[in-house]
């Protein structure tokens, strides 16, 4: 499979915990993501991970399993993935285009 570049928006949530807050879980997962060489950006509803498709999907699988290894019995992951073949575009590139259009 070709090394197609992708942007993946990932939201991972533990199910069945004693608290409505998930910040401890998010911090645990985010530390693991930051150990990866892939670029990532934490935001209010998840993390955007950038890189080759196979590497990004591999990391998502690893962090999902990591949640279980850390004692979370149920982990739910929502993933949105975007690719394009006409040009290379990072998450920041996409933001910059919109900000430029807003300022016009």
UniProtKB/Swiss-Prot annotation:
Gene that encodes the chain: ECM15
Top-rank taxon: Eukaryota
The protein, known as: UPF0045 protein ECM15
Signal peptide: none
Miscellaneous information on this protein: Present with 1900 molecules/cell in log phase SD medium.
Subunit structure, as described in the record: Homotetramer.
Matches recorded under NCBIfam families: MTH1187 family thiamine-binding protein
Similarity section: Belongs to the UPF0045 family.
Gene3D superfamilies: 3.30.70.930
PANTHER family per UniProt: UPF0045 PROTEIN ECM15 (PTHR33777:SF1)
Highest classification ranks of the organism: Eukaryota, Fungi, Dikarya, Ascomycota, Saccharomycotina
Keyword annotations of the record: Cytoplasm, Nucleus
Coiled coil: none
Protein location: Cytoplasm; Nucleus
Record-linked Pfam families: Thiamine_BP
Cellular component, GO annotation: cytoplasm; cytosol; nucleus
